[in-house]
Amino acid sequence: MLKFDNLILASSSKQRLSLLEQIGVVPGEIISPDIDEVILKKELPKAYSIRIAQAKCEKVKLLHPDKFVLSADTVVCCGRRILPKVETEEQALECIRLISGRRHRVYTTVCLYTPHGKLHCRNVVTVVKFKNLSVQEIDAYIDSRQWYGKSGACSIQTNAGKFVLSINGSYSSIIGLPLYETYSILNRYFSI
């Protein structure tokens, strides 16, 4: 694994850091950008994911204009409805009931700002289908609290993975960072 001192990961996500390490990249610094993640009226999931990932990148870039800044944002949606990053059992229950037995989409955008002011962004959409969950399965998942802080209450890399019937797209993108797209962007500037 290589540590890139001039690369900042603009994220507090442990999953994103772990995924970066899978492609042999360790950022020199990790900064959690504090941005407003409010959903705009009539904003579609893909546009929201792109806007938030860019905002994270731009916030950190203002503080460190001479560094590369990598950011990402993951959004879970059912239809056009963007599901929240859940913080309460009530929110988690609502989201899990909504996606039970249905397909939902996961949009992840990865962005890289260069020291030269160039912005690279890639958006990946993955379709996930959950089995029809019983009341007992929903209750057990809610009790596990593995949904906390996750978009749409989904944590398929942990306990919720057993509910997935199919994935059409990028598994790593669902967890928070599309590896192929991230590698492709970083490989333009770093030897990985």
UniProtKB/Swiss-Prot annotation:
Kindly list the cofactors needed.
a divalent metal cation
**Which InterPro entries is this protein grouped with?**
ITPase-like_fam, Maf-like
MF terms from GO for this chain are: nucleoside triphosphate diphosphatase activity
Keywords for this entry?
Cytoplasm, Hydrolase, Nucleotide metabolism
Q: Where in the cell is it found?
A: Cytoplasm
Q: In the Enzyme Commission scheme, what number(s) does this protein have?
A: 3.6.1.9
Question: Which principal EC class is assigned to this enzyme?
Answer: hydrolase
A Pfam short name:
Maf
Family note: Belongs to the Maf family.
What protein does this entry describe? Nucleoside triphosphate pyrophosphatase
Organism of this sequence: Ehrlichia canis (strain Jake)
